[in-house]
Amino acid sequence: IMQRGIVLNEGNRRVILDDGDGSEVYRRKPYTIRTLDPAQEKVDFWMVNDIHARDSVFQLLIKEAPEAQPDFVCLNGDLASQTETEQTLWDACLGSASKILTPAGIPLAVTRGNHENRGAYAQHWLDYFPTPTGETYYTFRRGPAFFIVLDGCEDKPDNDPRYYGMGDWNEYRRQQAEWLKGVVNSDEFRAAPVRIVLMHMIPGKEDSWYGEQQIRRLFVPELAGKGIDLMLCGHYHRYHWIDDGSRGVDFPILVNSNNDCLRVSADAKGIDLKVVNTAGAVIKQHRIDKKNK
């Protein structure tokens, strides 16, 4: 649905009614959404990843969001191990997101993980998470931060027997790399005070799995030296802070575990990161002071 006449950074409502006269929609206040505003001085967002249908863990990780009011929550891949039906996504975490985040007006930013490529219903991913590009890679601006969302695709070669010859992820990564060249040379990217990459998988080392090596070969040359401030990933199911250049990039990479929530606050001066466990305790912290890149 194309909505016109919306106001930046203010609550907006759209109510769609059917013939169900007297249904619950008449008995509750309509939910609101807050539109993106590039003039916003600070952006706060949370990230969870690798839920793999552990909905009870997901609920613990986002339960404080309605009170904290982050600008959005990023679901950074692998919501389920494979998607066989529409119900798979709902049971994995979207049902809880609709009960906890939606009434609070907190939107989602979603990346596709490698496991989202698996299962009979995998091809419907973009039906639930449409993007401005019509692809699983896209960009958006929230406050001072320009976000690049990338799809690392599968972690194994396309000819792996588990894919039944149905995937062409090598070509999809090449397609993204070409698109990425235009993104990092765009006025929108260059004008942003903060630049963050969201991707489920991480650029690899020489001994990494195939997909990670392809990410390094194709994506890293387009990202390194371009003024990226931070990359946020998942996939490993454990925490890593990588700032030693071992992945071929000149910016830090934070890999979030599958049991924690990453809370990020960014403005023109820098980025603050807190890793919070299911009990609500901060277990890791980082500060990135903004440099002129």
Segments and roles (model prediction):
Residues 1-32, 87-188, 218-224, 240-274:
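Extended active-site neighborhood of metal-dependent phosphoesterases/phosphodiesterases
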Residues 4, 8-87:
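N-terminal active-site segment of His-dependent metallophosphoesterases
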Residues 31, 73, 231, 274, ...:
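Generic beta-strand hydrophobic packing signal
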Residues 42-43, 71, 137, 144-145, ...:
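Alpha/beta-hydrolase fold active-site loops
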Residues 46-49, 72-78, 106-114, 196-200, ...:
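Active-site neighborhood of phospho(di)ester-bond hydrolases with catalytic His/Asp-centered motifs
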Residues 53-59, 81-85, 112-121, 155-159, ...:
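Active-site environment of divalent metal-dependent phosphoester hydrolases
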Residues 163-171, 187-233:
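Active-site-proximal segments of metal-dependent phosphoesterases and phosphodiesterases across multiple
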Residues 264-293:
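A short C-terminal boundary segment appended to hydrolase-like catalytic domains
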